[in-house]
Regions:
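Extended, low-hydrophobicity, Ser/Thr/Pro/Gly-biased non-transmembrane segments
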Residues: 107-225, 394, 584-593
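N-terminal, polar/Ser/Thr-rich
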Residues: 1-45, 123-129, 149, 463-464
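Surface-exposed beta-strand/loop patches in extracellular or lumenal glycoproteins
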Residues: 49-67, 156-162, 448, 493-514
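A surface-exposed beta-strand-loop module
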Residues: 55, 61, 65-124, 147, ...
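Hydrophobic alpha-helical and helix-loop surface patches within well-folded domains
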Residues: 199, 227-233, 237-504, 628, ...
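Aromatic/His-enriched, Gly/Pro-containing loop or helix-boundary segments
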Residues: 60, 79-97, 133, 137-140, ...
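Beta-strand-rich binding/interaction modules
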Residues: 69-76, 462-463, 475-556
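Long, ordered, helix-rich scaffold segments
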Residues: 487-492, 503-506, 521-525, 542-879
Length: 879
């Protein structure tokens, strides 16, 4: 039988044959505690009963299961030989009846990669914590099932757990009895006490959004109440969970505040009451994603619990994620895409709704600025990679699906929806959503199902819009052309639209064009605006004819559409001198984003972008934009600056960051942001001595509190430059002997400038699977230091020798982390590009998902080399 990589064709064939009525899943996780035998993987018992129908009696199919062993299989009362029907990933089901009952008793393995049932041991107190993460297809690591989104069914879960644990799942649960019985699974000899938790049956949901969380979690509770216009009353129990070690940092009251604001907002706009009973939110350790929308039991990465001082941008990001996952309760959980081709039907909508509700319901009213500056940057990058794809993608199999949780599916899709709202109007858009929920509740949909309701509510032909925006790839560029008359006023203003040769689609854009002039006090302010439809290669904006000559023309003012903004020569010259004078924060964010795209496209030298950041970032009021500028400036220096200018640019960034740090308001979030940026830029002896002094208390900057998280941020550059050794890092871990502290220490250890250190880090990640997913991530992050290019050079050939083996032997999550994280991007030379091309030519038969990752990394490298050539040319001309 085929392996574990389920194809779309297989899924469609199975969905045409089977209908699932119910699941009953019984898990025994008492083996999670106690000593590990060390003999094979630690396992737990999983017993699954599936009741399903087959519309072709006598036909054959299969169930999915990834497990070390299967104890028993029964189909319609017939005992099957597991060795004959189970191949490690599938259970063969032959001679099916019209109505069927399948019972599978298996030994499933706990995970250390964040896929399936993840087991985490807290180094602080030795407590064990479990949680599940499945998307797109890892529930089969925990129980036997039909692992595809369109075979929905109600689920009943029962979990046996250690006596002092609490267990949560999608439905409301209760502990019904204590048990003391033999543990049949590996590592569970003898008898062990426990408790049995049973959970209410769920509504029909897909396998990938079922969930179990178990352990001695700290829990805070609250409730949400809503009385609707017809008098009906809805009460939703709320819960918020984290590890006991994080309880002292857990601001559950703010989590609940945003949760209630979101529930109010979505009830106001969706006209469909929250359908899944309770609403728990668990912040869990070693999580691969930002969060996951399991109905009734949302899981988040625990880094959203802040151990030290952070800026408001961090609180805004957390609120956005809370609302994003909440939007999924309707877009994704209530109504689910039929197959991963239409992943956008949940992720694009949730991404859009996250910002839409953030601005409409919470204190974060500038959420669209963050969207324009941060989310769209992700989309623009993804849409220019060789792996770009339409928002509605061609997903052949599960490996394709895993990689398509990308900037196209999330941020471009959300940007397209923002354009759709401008195109059809907000009222028509929301009424379409309401009809969509009511028409397809607990079902599965395709693109056409959504377009149908939008055509009904807007009266517009959605087919042409969908073809341009959802079924083609690539990003358009919009550039203003200004012709002035003899009187100095605008005679004609046009918008020129361009597309890449590989994706030539010129789309219809609803845009606002803003005209800006400098005032007598130096402010750069908008004095005219026109909203228009751009179509084809050139569109005249007749509404602006006769306006005063502008200093700046901003195409896509207010960020209505998805495009790369370009500037005419006058506008670009104005920004070079007066960017800090732009008074509107959204306009300023859009200009910064456009300048960054120019840098990435080798149209603006990296040194010019760095210079703009040094000159104007200190005047940036939006903290999220400021932190994004810091990240872009670092990336410009590391990847796009000419090698011969890097040292000069690095000194300039460090000096500028330190000057801004000293000038920032004491105790302000801007001071904190500049402190962190200074640490990333520090390399000179005096800078490193200052960081050391801030750590040991011999130096002080008024108002700057060097808390534990900031201490680790200062230690990484000290470790990377050989100032903080293993002894220093061990002492810091003793000071912060927590799971978070361990991750920081591992990253800093791998950052040290030693050949032996790099060899050890490589062995731990590439040649061993002993590290958990979180420590793999931390090791990779420390390994690749921009100041250590020569030290890392020997790993270029080793990378290409290893990646196919890693992809074959390790889980897809770890494979992705290694292939992306260890690509020799810092060996930015034509020779590395040639080595990449040689690998691709010699491995045409490699897994498509693996080739996609290498092609993406190759494209980033080629783009960096073009940027370096542009920057070098600027340096030559300046000289």
């Amino acid at each position: 039988m085929p392996g574990e990589n389920l194809s779309r064709d297989e899924a469609r064939e199975r969905a045409a044959l089977l209908s699932v009525d119910a699941y009953e899943v019984s898990l025994d996780v008492r083996s999670a505690v106690g000593e590990d035998t060390g003999d094979g993987p630690r396992t737990f018992r999983s017993v699954t009963t599936i009741r399903f129908r087959c519309n072709e009696p006598g036909a054959s199919s299969f169930a999915d299961l990834l497990a070390p062993s299967v104890t028993a299989v029964s189909l319609n009362g017939r005992d099957l030989d597991p060795s004959e029907v189970f191949d490690g990933s599938r259970i063969l089901l032959e001679d099916l009846a019209a109505d069927n009952e399948l019972v599978v008793d298996a030994q499933c393995a706990y995970s250390r990669t964040g896929e399936g049932l993840h087991r985490f041991v807290d180094p602080e107190d030795g407590e064990v914590y479990l949680y599940t993460q499945y998307e797109p297809a890892d529930s089969r690591r925990v129980f036997a099932n039909f692992e595809q989104p369109d075979l929905k069914a109600p689920f009943r879960f029962e979990v046996r757990a250690p006596e002092d644990w609490t267990v949560w799942s999608n439905g409301v649960g209760e502990r019904i009895e204590k048990v003391r019985e033999a543990l049949p699974q590996k590592g569970g000899g003898g008898r062990r006490a426990g408790g049995v938790w049973r959970f209410a049956e769920t509504k029909p949901i897909s396998t990938y959004i079922t969930c179990v969380v178990a352990g001695p979690y700290h829990q805070v509770t609250d409730s949400y109440e809503r009385v609707f216009e017809d008098g009906t009353r809805l009460e939703i129990p709320l819960g918020a969970l984290c590890r006991k070690g994080l309880a002292k940092h857990f601001d559950a009251e703010d989590v609940f505040l945003v949760t209630k604001q979101g529930l109010d907002f979505f009830h106001d706009h969706f006209d469909y009451p929250y359908p899944f009973g309770k609403y728990d939110q668990a912040f869990v350790p070693e999580y691969n994603l930002g969060a996951m929308e399991n109905p009734g039991m949302v899981t988040f990465r625990e880094e959203y619990i802040f151990r030290g001082k952070v800026t408001q941008a961090s609180y805004e990001a957390r609120a956005n994620v809370i609302l994003h996952e909440m939007a999924h309760m309707w877009f994704g959980d209530l109504v689910t895409m039929e197959w991963w081709d239409d992943l956008w039907l949940k992720e694009s909508f949730a991404d859009f709704m996250g910002s839409f509700s953030l601005v409409g319901a919470t204190r974060f009213t500038d959420g669209w600025i963050t969207f324009a500056n941060r989310r769209k940057a992700w989309a623009y990058r993804a849409d220019q990679l060789p792996s770009t794809h339409p928002v509605t993608a061609d997903i052949r199999d599960l490996q394709d699906a895993k990689l398509n949780f990308d900037g196209i599916t999330y941020a471009k899709g959300a940007s397209v929806l923002k354009q759709l709202v401008a195109y059809v109007g907000q009222d028509a858009f929301l009424e379409g959503a309401r009809r969509y929920f009511k028409r397809h509740a607990y079902g599965n949909t395709r693109l056409g199902d959504l377009l149908a309701v939008l055509e009904e509510t807007s009266g517009r032909d959605m087919g042409a819009w969908a073809r341009s925006w959802l079924q083609t790839a690539g990003v358009n560029s919009l550039t203003p052309q200004v012709v002035l008359g003899a009187d100095g006023r605008i005679e004609e203003l046009a918008v020129v639209q361009e597309a890449a040769e590989s994706y030539p689609e010129l789309r219809p854009h609803r845009v606002a064009v803003g005209l800006y002039q400098r005032s007598q006090v130096g402010a750069l302010e908008r004095y005219a605006r026109a909203e228009t439809d751009v179509a084809g290669a050139r569109t005249v904006v007749s509404e602006l004819a006769g306006a005063d000559a502008p200093d700046l023309v901003l195409v896509n003012d207010d960020d209505l559409t998805y495009c790369k903004i370009r500037f005419d020569e006058t506008s670009l010259a104005t920004l070079r001198e007066h960017l800090g004078g732009l008074t509107d924060p959204l306009a300023r964010a859009l200009c910064w984003s456009a300048l960054w795209n120019l840098t990435r496209d080798a149209l603006l030298p990296a040194r010019d972008f760095v210079g703009l950041v040094l000159r104007f970032a200190g005047r940036e009021s939006d903290i999220g934009v400021l932190q994004m500028l810091h990240a872009w400036a670092e990336s410009a220096l590391v990847h796009y600056a000419a090698p011969q200018w890097r040292e000069t640019g690095g000194r300039a960034l460090a000096e500028g960051a330190l000057a801004e740090l000293r000038q920032a308001e004491p105790g302000s979030e801007h001071q904190l942001a500049w402190a962190r940026f200074f640490a990333t830029a520090a390399s000179a002896p005096d800078d490193l001595e200052l960081l050391k002094g801030l750590l040991d208390g011999t130096e002080e900057i008024a108002g700057l509190e060097v808390d534990q998280e900031l201490r680790w941020a200062f230690l990484e550059p000290l470790a990377a430059h050989g100032v903080a050794d293993e002894k220093v890092l061990a002492a810091e871990l003793a000071r912060d002997d927590t799971a978070s502290g361990k991750r920081h220490q591992v990253r800093c250890l791998a950052a040290r400038p030693s050949a032996a250190v790099k060899a050890g880090a490589w062995e731990q990640v590439v040649d061993s699977d002993a590290l958990s997913n979180a420590l793999v991530e931390a090791t990779i992050a420390g390994f690749g230091q921009a100041s250590q290019r020569e030290l890392l050079a020997p790993y270029t050939p080793r990378y290409f020798e290893a990646i196919e083996r890693v992809w074959t032997e390790r889980s897809i999550q770890i494979g992705m982390d290694v292939v992306r994280g260890l690509f020799p991007a810092l060996q930015d030379s034509p020779e590395t590009l040639e080595a990449t091309d040689a690998w691709l030519a010699a491995h045409e038969g490699a897994a498509p998902a693996l080739r996609r990752l290498v092609l993406e990394a190759r494209d980033d490298l080629a783009r960096a080399l073009r940027g370096q050539a542009c920057d070098a040319a600027a340096g030559t001309s300046a000289g």
